[in-house]
Amino acid sequence: MQLATMIASPNSRRFRVAGVIAALALVALILHLRLRWQPAPFEYAHEYYQSVRSYFKGSVYNNTLYTDGNDMVDPYFNSSAPCANFPNTDGVLLVMKTGATEAFDRMPTHLLTTLSCLPDFLLFSDMEQQIGPYHIFDALAEFEESAKAHNDDFDLYRNQKECPVSQKSCIDAKSEGHKAWNLDKYKFLPMMEQTWRMRPNHDWYIFAEADTYIFWANMIHWLKKQSGFDPREKLYLGSRSFIGGTPFAHGGSGYILSGTLLRHLIEYHPGVVKQYNVKGSNECCGDLMLAMALEEYESVKVRQAWPMINGEKPSTLPYGPGHWCEPLLTMHHMNSEEISSVWQFEQTRKVDRILMIRDVYEGLIQPKMQVSRANWDNLSDDVCYINPDPEAQDRAEGHFRDRQKKQEDMNDVEKEAWKSWENCAKVCASQDEPDDKSSNEKKRSRTCFQYRWHEEVCCTAKSFKLGAPKPAPGDSSSKAKWMSGWHLKGINEWIDAMGECKEPAWKKAEL
């Protein structure tokens, strides 16, 4: 009996073990809380970030757009839910056009960014191709053989089909660029026909190039709420350009057709595609031919949606008057790295409002602005000052000569501006008020924000742009140097004087 009482039952042993574990857990909790109560070291935020990473399905990275003083974006890029804030695109279809010589350079970035959030889209090219699970349709597959047979514009089309390896190996995109351009114009009308056949009855059709970026949140808000347009009407929207007096929506900037207009064009006029295929050899551009067909058959002209539908990219946008509080719907000439950067900016922006041109400047361009850059072209060309010597005048490009300020209208600083980049830099500074206490109205009316100097030509600009690098000159003479500079004081004063954009400056797309 005594022995029996000395031997504990299995249940009692389990209770004792559980008690010991509970006690140890309590001690561990107290130690943990005590450490948390202590002042957090500088590395605490990083340690906390590391501890929560496992809770995200995707990865969290340092945001490469984040810099000291740039409070537009979050310091971390959480890629676990890239489509969480993507708008509802029901009734809207994207149709993107590319070329076989560029598809594998341009399309993958689109597919990894904005296109990854679209439930459906169509891709067209001048050759049928496959990128992973995504199919690219040949817009010219049904083009009449008789129209192609004796047309040199189709030499590239035939060469691409005969290439037994990758297009990169057979076709030099740089040297064959003009051939790709000549071939491209034939895709527009056949693409309309195939789009309607494959994806009929959408409210809106957005057509874009492989170097076009679309701000989808802005675009859907504008089409469905802000514009006031009814897709049951025949509508053609874009950034208007002119050739020979004919207005058309610039293809690279992107353009929009209402479903009603596309249906009418294709279903009511079955011969339009064939007719314009023949016309193509005598016209320069496919976007022009589309506009001609819409006017001829539907009596519809393009409605101007610029600068919202825009032909520039962040580094070439002319920030300033007319390009500030306006929302952006598209941008053009975007390479893959730029597309990725703008997507990243949209993903990591701290604010959830309509994205305006000002936001692009403050988030992507302002952190890179500095007083001057050598071997750089910031695209200043609004007002020019050129060496008055006849030989120098002949040497200068006609575009710059046409924008010279008259000698009798120049002040003393401007008369010396062509002599050196240092002199050129003084032109914008000469507009500053002596007491630096000018009114906001005066600051808002500033007309000189930056300069560019090269070969005794000094030009200033009424807006501010970042621009792009120029090769260092082989000529050792100082006048061959490219120099660009920004009057940061004037730029920042203008921005302060403008104040906050209280409301997005939506533009009414009018004829």
Describe each model-derived feature in a short phrase.
Residues 3, 8-66, 282-288, 293-511:
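C-terminal catalytic/acceptor-binding lobe
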Residues 93-101:
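A conserved hydrophobic helix/loop-capping motif in glycosyltransferases and polysaccharide synthases
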Residues 178-179, 248, 273-282, 318, ...:
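Active-site rim elements
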